[in-house]
Amino acid sequence: MSDTTLSLLSPEKRKALEFAISQIERSFGKGSIMRLGDATSMKVETISSGALTLDLALGGGLPKGRIIEIYGPESSGKTTLALHAIAEVQKAGGVAAFVDAEHALDPTYAAALRVDIQNLLVAQPDTGEAALEIVDQLVRSTAVDIIVVDSVAALVPRAEIEGDMGESHVGLQARLMSQALRKINGNISKTGCTVIFLNQLRQKIGLTYGNPETTTGGVALKFYASVRLDIRRVQTLKKGTEEFGIRAKVKVAKNKVAPPFRIAEFDIIFGKGIANLGCILDMAEEVGVITRKGAWYSYNGENLAQGRDNTINYMEENPSFAQEIEQQVRQRFDQRVALSANTAAYTEEEIGEGE
């Protein structure tokens, strides 16, 4: 509420408002309520996903202090993407935890993705209740920066595990997720911990129209997640007849902190993970940091290499150069976002004047 708006309030209303705010702050702590215009920082902090194309599609990266859902079919890159996010947090000095409900974490592969497995917190709970209680306690500790839960489908309620095979437990997992997320969500926002849930796809039985695909665990996660990423395998990468990776396509199905429905693509190399240098090169060419004439890539008028693979090899041999290019791409992207925001604000002012 601006000073102009406050000045329009009667002295009695203004006094009542200030008293209510002071009472709320006394009961729930300083900062529990504020005028949005008084916030010291309006921009949501982010962490890198490990793929520059996806970071830019997300508006800068994965938001801190939010719930994120990554879903898709099998072997589409869900765990790889989550492990890259963990590696980025650890690289910045943060603490990461992996709740392995599927009991399928491969430490060798995680290490290949530059995850510090010596300091990675890993839990392999037997029940869904135990897994979500572990997540809640880690979040409330305020010491953990990112938690990955792999996966929602493997969060089996205790009643189902202790019951007989074939016994019906309709809606039990959905109720478990709904109760847990109600409890966890507020603490996540306060502590700044990012919680990533990996999820699988299921088919709706008997559906004639619409999308037959749905995710497990009910609708609570769809509601509480600030970001939902739909990841798909769109191409198999080959050298001759030998397969060496996949091309992944990610659609930002939901985004509460930036415009949604953007799409990002990147390569995942078997045994190595996301080929981020390829992402940097593609985005650098798109925003004009690096130019291409024919097969030659050039920077500031100087040729780098001939062909995409050779240019990526050059960037791999010169990491400081690759870092410089990435910074310039992010700066160009931020300038584009600021320009579009200013244009939108100017248009709104014009509309207001016209009225």
Curated annotation (Swiss-Prot):
Gene Ontology molecular function: ATP binding; ATP hydrolysis activity; ATP-dependent DNA damage sensor activity; damaged DNA binding; single-stranded DNA binding
Chief location of this protein within or outside the cell: cytoplasm
Keywords: ATP-binding, Cytoplasm, DNA damage, DNA recombination, DNA repair, DNA-binding, Nucleotide-binding, SOS response
Binding site for ATP: 72-79
Keyword DNA damage: yes
InterPro entries, per database record: AAA+_ATPase, DNA_recomb/repair_RecA, DNA_recomb/repair_RecA_CS, P-loop_NTPase, RecA-like_C, RecA-like_N, RecA_ATP-bd, RecA_C_sf
Source superkingdom: Bacteria
Protein name stated in the entry: Protein RecA
Species, as recorded: Thermosynechococcus vestitus (strain NIES-2133 / IAM M-273 / BP-1)
Gene name, Swiss-Prot/TrEMBL: recA
